[in-house]
Design a protein with these regions (language model features):
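Gly/Pro-rich turn-and-neighbor structural signature
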Residues: 1-50, 135
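A glycine-rich, aromatic-flanked flexible loop/lid motif
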Residues: 27-33, 62-72, 99-103, 194-199, ...
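Structured core elements
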Residues: 33-37, 51-54, 61-63, 72-74, ...
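Short beta-alpha connecting loops at secondary-structure transitions
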Residues: 36-49, 55, 73-88, 105-123, ...
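Catalytic-core signal marking the mid-to-C-terminal active-site face
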Residues: 91, 95-232
Length: 232
């Protein structure tokens, strides 16, 4: 629910920013068109089969509301907490999207939660808190000047999340709750992509050869021109 409200908040904020800051008068041109890779942070190495339902729930968060629906969606693979996904693992995530799109009526209706006191209230809270964060960034001189501050806040947020999980305050199934489990056929190193070290060595050699043979003067000139244009 909160993830869906975040998308609704983004949509409302973008509409207002486009109208007030940039003077865009056409409501269609102010639509928040976004693509999203849903969060992989919540995927767990323990009981990785639980990651499937986590991925489905995250997909619903960015597709339930028509007015704030992602225009493109990428889902992580169930085993990304274990290692690199194989093509079959990536296909599984693709099939999740296809089942949601073509075997359900998820896309058949408009704003499902329009008028809900819970949804509207939470969305308003998120808009207010997000605007406060945006004001802080603008006060620091914009996104570029605020990079260090934003990185610091991200690290602090992640640290706090880990503290809550380790203390049991935030429940994560299979990690700090309901940890008993039957043996899973999905665990172990056999269920991740293994890259031949020779492939890595060949790629490094190809990159080194390309760098050795490129026209460095042309590269430097192009970078200088790019910097000049960016500063104008």
């Amino acid at each position: 629910i909160e993830e869906n409200c975040k998308m609704r908040a983004f949509t409302q904020m973008w509409d207002r920013i486009c109208e007030e800051r940039y003077g865009v008068t056409d409501p269609k041109a102010r639509r928040f068109r976004y693509g999203v890779q849903v969060n992989s942070l919540g995927l767990t190495e323990a009981q990785p089969e639980n990651n499937i339902q986590r991925i489905v729930l995250e997909a619903l968060g960015v597709t339930l509301s028509k007015s704030a629906r992602a225009r493109s969606l990428q889902l992580p693979a169930w085993n990304e907490a274990l290692g690199l996904p194989r093509p079959w693992d990536q296909q599984w995530s693709l099939r999740i999207m296809q089942v949601l799109a073509f075997e359900t009526d998820l896309l058949a209706y408009g704003a499902l939660f329009e008028g809900s006191k819970v949804i509207e209230g939470l969305t308003a809270e998120l808009v207010e808190s997000a605007q406060a964060e945006l004001d802080d960034i603008l006060a620091l001189g914009g996104a570029f000047e605020a990079i260090d501050e934003m990185k610091g806040r991200l690290v602090r947020s992640h640290t706090e999340r880990m503290r809550r999980i380790e203390s049991g305050e935030q429940m994560v199934i299979g990690v700090n709750a309901f940890t008993e489990t039957a043996e899973s056929p999905l665990g172990g190193e056999d269920n991740i992509l293994k890259v031949d070290p020779a492939v890595q060595a060949a790629a490094i050699d190809e990159l080194a050869e390309w760098k050795a043979n490129r026209d460095q003067a042309a590269v430097d000139a192009a970078l200088d021109e790019l910097e000049r244009v960016a500063r104008t």
